[in-house]
C-alpha cells in the first residue's frame, strides 16, 4: 500500500471510495492491519480500557500514547498514523502544542482532539504549525461524565443544528478530518455532505466517508462482555486475524458494513 496522506484521504472522499480505520497499539497489529489494507491506524485513548483495564479513557497520558505511537510506527506499512490527544492534554493552547508535538515526534501523522466548536482555536494553532488535526465530535468519551454516560448525541434538533454548525466551523478552522461517534445516521450524512474534508463514522451510519472500529471489538475481544450496537465481530468464520481485518476492509468498501442495525435513528 502506498503511503496514505491527508491528500490521498481527501482524494478518496472526492472519488467516493470508503476509508477504513482501526485502532492499533503495537507493531505486530500495525503490520497486520496495514498489510490488510487499512488506511488509517488510530492510537486511541481507548487503550486505557482495552489494554490497561480502566473503566474510561481518562487515565491515559500523553507519554503512554506516545509510547504506543512509536510501537505502531515500527510495524506500519504505509497507513496513516492518527494519535489521540488524551484527556486534558489540550487544557491550554501551550499544552495542546507541546503534547501534539510529542505525539508527532513519536511517529503520528495527524492528531485527534475531542470536542466541538470551542476546539477551533486549538485546531487553527496546530494547522498553522504543520500538524494535521482530526476533530472528534458527537459522543466524546473524554467528556463521559458531562454527557451522563455513553449515549447517542444529536437526537434533538437543537443539538443536531449545533453539531452541523460546529463541524463547518472546525473545518474552517483547519481540521483535516472529522470523526463522528454515536450520532443519528441522517445527521452524519448531512454533516458528511456539508464539509469538504473526510468524515469517519463509528455508530454513525453508512453515509460517512469511512468507518472506524476498536480493534478488540471487531475481533470479538471484550473483558466486560458488553458489545456496542455499532460493532460487528469480523473474526467469525475467519481463519486468522489478518483475514478478519481484510473482511472488515472489504465490508466497508463494498458498503455491506455498517448495516442499518449498526446505526442510530434521531
Curated annotation (Swiss-Prot):
InterPro entries (alphabetical): Pantoate_hydroxy_MeTrfase (IPR003700), Pyrv/PenolPyrv_kinase-like_dom (IPR015813), Pyrv_kinase-like_dom_sf (IPR040442)
Acyltransferase found in the keyword field: no
Pfam families documented for this protein: Pantoate_transf
Pathway connected to this protein: Cofactor biosynthesis; (R)-pantothenate biosynthesis; (R)-pantoate from 3-methyl-2-oxobutanoate: step 1/2
Record EC number: 2.1.2.11
Catalytic-site annotation from UniProt: 181 (proton acceptor)
Record text on cofactor binding: Binds 1 Mg(2+) ion per subunit.
Keywords: Cytoplasm, Magnesium, Metal-binding, Pantothenate biosynthesis, Transferase
Residues binding Mg(2+): 45, 84, 114
Catalytic activity: 3-methyl-2-oxobutanoate + (6R)-5,10-methylene-5,6,7,8-tetrahydrofolate + H2O = 2-dehydropantoate + (6S)-5,6,7,8-tetrahydrofolate
UniProt cofactor(s): Mg(2+)
First-level EC class: transferase
Chain's role: Catalyzes the reversible reaction in which hydroxymethyl group from 5,10-methylenetetrahydrofolate is transferred onto alpha-ketoisovalerate to form ketopantoate.
Name of the featured protein: 3-methyl-2-oxobutanoate hydroxymethyltransferase
Amino acid at each position: 500500500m502506498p503511503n496514505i496522506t491527508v491528500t490521498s484521504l481527501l482524494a478518496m472522499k472526492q472519488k467516493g471510495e470508503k476509508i477504513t480505520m482501526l485502532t492499533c497499539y503495537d507493531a505486530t497489529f500495525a503490520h497486520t492491519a496495514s498489510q490488510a489494507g487499512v488506511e488509517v491506524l488510530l492510537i486511541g485513548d481507548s487503550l486505557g480500557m482495552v489494554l490497561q483495564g480502566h473503566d474510561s479513557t481518562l487515565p491515559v497520558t500523553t507519554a503512554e500514547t506516545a509510547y504506543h505511537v512509536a510501537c505502531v510506527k515500527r510495524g506500519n506499512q504505509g497507513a496513516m498514523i492518527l494519535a489521540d490527544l488524551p484527556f486534558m492534554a489540550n487544557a491550554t493552547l501551550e499544552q495542546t502544542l507541546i503534547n501534539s508535538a510529542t505525539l508527532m515526534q513519536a511517529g503520528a501523522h495527524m492528531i485527534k482532539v475531542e470536542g466541538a466548536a470551542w476546539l477551533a482555536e486549538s485546531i487553527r494553532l496546530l494547522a498553522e504549525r504543520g500538524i494535521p488535526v482530526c476533530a472528534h465530535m458527537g459522543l466524546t468519551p473524554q467528556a463521559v461524565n458531562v454527557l451522563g454516560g455513553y449515549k447517542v448525541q444529536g437526537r434533538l434538533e437543537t443539538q443536531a443544528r449545533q453539531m452541523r454548525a460546529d463541524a463547518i466551523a472546525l473545518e474552517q478552522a483547519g481540521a483535516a478530518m472529522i470523526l463522528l461517534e454515536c450520532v443519528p445516521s441522517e445527521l452524519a450524512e448531512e454533516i458528511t455532505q456539508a464539509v469538504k474534508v473526510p468524515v469517519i463514522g463509528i455508530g454513525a451510519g453508512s453515509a460517512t466517508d469511512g468507518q472506524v472500529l476498536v480493534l478488540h471489538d471487531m475481533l470479538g475481544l471484550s473483558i466486560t462482555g458488553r458489545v456496542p450496537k455499532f460493532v460487528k465481530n469480523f473474526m467469525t468464520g475467519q481463519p486468522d486475524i489478518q483475514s478478519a481485518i481484510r473482511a472488515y476492509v472489504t465490508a466497508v468498501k463494498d458498503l455491506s458494513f455498517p448495516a442499518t442495525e449498526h446505526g442510530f435513528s434521531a
